[in-house]
Design a protein with these regions (language model features):
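Residues lining hydrophobic/aromatic ligand-binding pockets adjacent to catalytic sites
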Residues: 1-119
Length: 119
């Protein structure tokens, strides 16, 4: 079974990370591609620009943001393709990398939970 975890993209890469995927639509400032040590950047699974701007990292909006983002993921072919790829390849560990400062209210949490439900 594939374990899906999240981690800040600025945190030190680890051999325990397994497959490292940057799940932000935009490349995080100050992070080089070499330092990120990515296996992929499926930016099409990130929240839409409109949803990201509406949320604006406001913890008070996180519950509704999560509901809206899950609805986007349910209708997103790229998200279903990613889940199918992970089911087929069966990596032991996948680490979703994000650039947000808030570790408790960010889209990677929602995506992690959605992927866990779809693997």
């Amino acid at each position: 079974m594939t374990h899906v975890e999240i981690k800040k993209v600025r945190d030190e890469p680890s051999s325990d990370d397994g497959v490292r995927l940057l799940v932000d639509r935009l490349w995080p400032r100050g992070v080089s591609k070499a330092d990120a040590e990515l296996d992929g950047h499926p930016k099409d699974v990130a929240p839409s620009t409109d949803l990201r701007k509406w949320f604006d990292h406001d913890p008070k909006k996180f519950q509704e943001f999560g509901d809206r983002y899950r609805a986007e993921l349910d209708d997103n072919d790229a998200a279903h393709d990613l889940a199918a790829k992970l089911r087929d390849e069966r990596p032991q560990q996948v680490t979703l990398l994000y650039g947000a400062k808030d570790e408790e209210h960010n889209h990677a949490i929602v995506l992690r939970d959605w992927l866990r439900d779809h693997l």
